[in-house]
């Protein structure tokens, strides 16, 4: 696995964990929610910008993206 891919995976796991903690979800629930409402795709597509933000800002961005795609958590 290349270093870039490894960094992206580590970052995504960290973001899913932070999202889960923020909303009181399990990791599995958080991943399913983010995957269903395009949060995972957003993290992958916007990695270069998002990984430079604080985790609080990233969780907020994920919440907005998922809400725009039908998610209920705000």
Question: Where is each model-derived feature located?
Answer:
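C-terminal alpha-helical interaction appendages
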Residues: 1-74
């Amino acid at each position: 696995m290349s270093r870039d891919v490894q960094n992206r995976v580590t970052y995504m796991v960290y973001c899913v964990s932070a999202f889960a903690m923020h909303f009181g979800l399990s990791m599995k629930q958080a991943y399913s929610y983010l995957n269903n409402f395009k949060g995972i795709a957003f993290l992958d597509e916007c990695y270069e910008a998002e990984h430079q933000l604080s985790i609080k800002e990233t969780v907020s961005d994920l919440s907005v993206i998922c809400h725009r795609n039908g998610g209920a958590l705000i």
